[in-house]
């Protein structure tokens, strides 16, 4: 991996934002419909704000979160030993998801399925990071964190993702608690109401966390076989490419 500096990471993010701004604008506009932002038909016209977008989205989310989850590896003509191995794999995957949900619950977040259902319906994309992580005591835990596609940035290579980054805002006290770093240096007088942009960056080997100005976590091997991020648009519509830009927000230029 290249030894990325905060400036290089932010440059990648800014360039990708420029390329995908129509998509992110659409995501934000869809969320406004869900929040029932008041509709203004213009001067001289009566306006009515329908709750249909919110009701419809909530119905889809409820279907997705209440459906029975099935993890199945087909037996086929496998012998008894292979069938038992497949059963163990199914139980392992179910246990991984359960462990991931428990970690999210401790962090006061909805479960994996709940978050992904919401993002799928409201953003039209799914995204997240999945890793097995060792803590300071050497214990391994499951870390599955859904990401909001609105704040997810990525680059593609020959075999898929070449890098991915999740941009969030955190307070100085949160940064201190998570990474044990004083933003602005020791004794810096920063109001804890100040939100600081934090970039959680992954490539196929390393993970780096930084702000606009400093590294919070230096390049660390994440142990994955590639970029440990899952990401994609919802549905079966391929990323088609029009001869000219259509403005319909469904061509490759808008993704």
Label each PLM-derived region with a short phrase.
Residues 1-209, 215, 221:
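Extended, helix-rich architectural segments
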Residues 209-255:
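Extended, charged amphipathic alpha-helical segments
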């Amino acid at each position: 991996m290249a030894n990325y500096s905060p400036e290089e990471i932010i440059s990648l993010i800014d360039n990708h934002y420029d390329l995908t701004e129509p998509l992110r604008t659409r995501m934000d506009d869809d969320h406004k419909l869900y929040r029932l932002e008041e509709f203004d038909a213009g001067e001289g016209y009566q306006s009515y704000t329908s709750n249909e977008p919110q009701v419809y989205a909530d119905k889809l989310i409820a279907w997705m979160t209440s459906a029975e989850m099935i993890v199945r590896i087909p037996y086929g003509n496998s012998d008894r030993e292979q069938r038992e191995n497949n059963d163990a794999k199914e139980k392992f995957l179910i246990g991984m998801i359960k462990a991931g949900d428990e970690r999210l619950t401790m962090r006061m977040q909805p479960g994996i399925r709940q978050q992904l259902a919401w993002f799928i319906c409201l953003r039209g994309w799914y995204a997240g990071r999945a890793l097995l992580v060792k803590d300071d005591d050497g214990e391994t835990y499951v870390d599955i964190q859904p990401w909001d596609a609105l704040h997810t940035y990525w680059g593609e290579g020959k075999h898929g993702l070449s890098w991915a980054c999740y941009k969030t805002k955190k307070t100085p006290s949160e940064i201190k608690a998570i990474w044990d770093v004083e933003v602005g240096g020791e004794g810096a007088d920063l109001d804890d109401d100040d939100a600081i942009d934090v970039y959680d960056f992954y490539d196929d080997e390393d993970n780096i966390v930084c702000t606009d100005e400093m590294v919070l976590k230096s390049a660390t091997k994440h142990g994955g076989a590639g970029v440990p991020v899952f990401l994609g648009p919802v549905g079966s519509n391929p990323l088609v490419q029009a001869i000219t830009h259509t403005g319909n927000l469904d061509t490759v230029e808008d993704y």
